[in-house]
Amino acid sequence: MIKERPIPVLEVFGPTVQGEGMVIGRKTMFVRTAGCDYSCSWCDSAFTWDGSGKDDIRLLAASDVIAELETIGGAAFDHVTISGGNPALLPQLGGLIDGLHARGIQVALETQGSRWQPWFADIDDLTLSPKPPSSGMSTNWEVLDDIVRRLSEAGRRFCMKVVVFDDEDLAYAKLVHERYPGIPFYAQAGNDNLTETDPAIMLPYLVERYEWLIGRTMADETLRGIHVLPQLHTWVWGNKKGV
Amino acid sequence: MIKERPIPVLEVFGPTVQGEGMVIGRKTMFVRTAGCDYSCSWCDSAFTWDGSGKDDIRLLAASDVIAELETIGGAAFDHVTISGGNPALLPQLGGLIDGLHARGIQVALETQGSRWQPWFADIDDLTLSPKPPSSGMSTNWEVLDDIVRRLSEAGRRFCMKVVVFDDEDLAYAKLVHERYPGIPFYAQAGNDNLTETDPAIMLPYLVERYEWLIGRTMADETLRGIHVLPQLHTWVWGNKKGV
């Protein structure tokens, strides 16, 4: 019997609310995997790839991850979000997804869309979140096209999400929406203040960023079917980790 | 030819973001109808039923409503939310819904579930929002059961939403979720401060109310598949009307 490859896990926490995107508000548990092929300038989870979190990485079997989810979350959840880093680097996640489904638990996952995995077609709430110019990364459109094509063929519910910090990012968001017109599209106001800890400063600033994005998108005829959302968890918990 | 019955309209505005529930963040136009069979203690649109807005009511044909939506929203929208009051008091809304669909525009509607209309089955995003004890209203469960049964038979996407102000409301929310277990369920933190105009006071208060509701629901095993959301528009615009 071939030994299952373990999963590099950095955090397991919850239940909490999903703060972004297509299932915003959903009660969910989080599993955060280590490792990323990107290094976005404004990444809010840089410890997953910049080396600073390396001592916290645990190599766990899928069954261990599920056991830990059940220890922490008890019977209070039926939804798990796999986050990163880029979980799409890990072919071995298929076993975890199958194990969760076997327990009646739904699975959400977000990835930048730089790498395909066959288990994408099994994710209940899949978000492809290509990164805009402000990230410093560049999009491989051929790979992204291929992922969108495969998911569409599989008849799978998924959405596109672009984080927007400035007008250049917004132009990129429009490009993405025009390239994949049939796919539900989310624009998210970016948080470019990752160090502020005072909610009295943080909260009005984030609301102002969200209001800016609303102002830039509402009258735009190329963004008719758009959702515009904040990162709700940063409004509640600021830059705190593990909530 | 039978003359179409006009629609009592109080407000037409947008495009803006939907601030609540199953399509939170969605770019949408709003049509607010006059009249309600309820008079919730904390209603944020009491002008639709308490007489204070009666001089603003216009009796419009469906085609006039659509023309006004297009004048205000141009070609920048593909989604309209019909709100109230209780729009379910108006059998004549079917023509408006058909007219919007004919233009490729999706329609959302929220109602307390006190009255069935055949056009419920045509709504793209329908929210049934029975009112908890703090409203001072009482739920007719037979009517609500009947509406849920008809919508389920029609294979229509819809959800349940309960606004929660206190623990008694939360107990009611659980009752609703247990009664309709297969239906996507949203709990929404209530805004019991309808007069505050200072965002520096309003915003932290609303965040605190939302955090309270998260705290009361996350560990609860009877609320596994729940979404917990704020009224996002009140976080951005406070108690302002028409945004």
What are these regions (language model features)?
Chain A
Residues 34-38:
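Cys/His-enriched microdomains
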Residues 6-10, 14, 229-232:
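Generic secondary-structure boundary/loop-capping signal
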Residues 17-22, 39, 237-238:
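Short N-terminal binding/cap micro-motifs at the start of the first secondary-structure element
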Residues 3, 10-11, 17, 27-28, ...:
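Conserved Radical SAM active-site core
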Residues 77, 88-243:
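Conserved AdoMet/S-adenosylmethionine-binding subsite of the radical SAM
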Residues 21, 43, 52-55, 172, ...:
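Short linear functional motifs in flexible/disordered or boundary regions
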